Amino acid sequence: MATPQAPELVPAQYLLSPDAAGPRTLIDILYDTAACYPEAAAIDDGTVQLTYSELISDIEASVAWLAARGIGRGDRIGIRMPSGSFALYEAILATLAVGAAYVPVDADDPDERAELVFGEANVVAIVSEAGMARGPGSSRGWRASAPLPRDDAWIIFTSGSTGTPKGVAVTHRSAAAFVDAEAQMFLQDNMIGPGDRVLAGLSVAFDASCEEMWLAWRHGACLVPAPRSLVRSGMDLGPWLVSRDVTVVSTVPTLAALWPAEALEAVRLLIFGGEACPPELATRLAVEGREVWNTYGPTEATVVACAARLDGVGPVRIGLPLPGWDLAVVDTD
């Protein structure tokens, strides 16, 4: 058993913090991608499809609008919008681009939870389907500007061990390091890129939604949001994946187990997380031409801390740390 006082006892393959990518922000990532693939599709909700250049244009207009209303770097904005719409993701990106952190609450959650979360997070504004309203918090008074790596990107509230919501803030540096780390792991022989379509099926109040978004936007792929009602139906989502030409999916094993094999024929990257993956599911879905990964990580560790590629034959493991992460087993001392 290793302890912080005895790092030499931790095998080298579990200590990958020296492999972390250089510090940058999520907005840096988005602009780099847009510069490489300006005419590639960035988001397609079935009604509206935007290229990366169009998405950037929309975001910059929103930043000017937010700045004119006194919102700037270091502020926090509550996001409570229905899933499945490009407008939800534009609101998140505009929040990041103005230098603020987004605080998501599922649109279907009770009003009491929204009030608790937004009050605890001290949000200065709340964006909903109806528009933007004033929040319970006060602005820091800083001007709108591009975020710095040390600035918070999001604050996501978990249930906490006591059942009381607990906010976990993640900086741009940590978030971008996570995005860049996954780029070093998945589909190295034929990387994600324009032409790939990434499912956005998770609630943005769940930190794994960040993986969905940035699997697309780090690589010039297209984010394809699914309405919450469709995701909750379970089985109906399978045929929808086919109709929307989805090629990359990050989901929970319980949901994937409901889909027929043909629903995933075009999916070349399938990522599991959020719960244990049954070995029989890995055996069924880890087929030639598709990478299947099992991931694990607490919210505090920035979405995912470790991952293992599944071959459908060996045991299901949580794997080794992402590049830039360390893993250790410690005792109470």
Where are these regions (language model features)?
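Motif- and composition-driven signal specific to adenylation
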Residues: A87-Y89, A100-A114, G141-D333
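Carrier-protein-dependent adenylate-forming modules in NRPS/ANL systems
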Residues: M1-A176, M191, G220
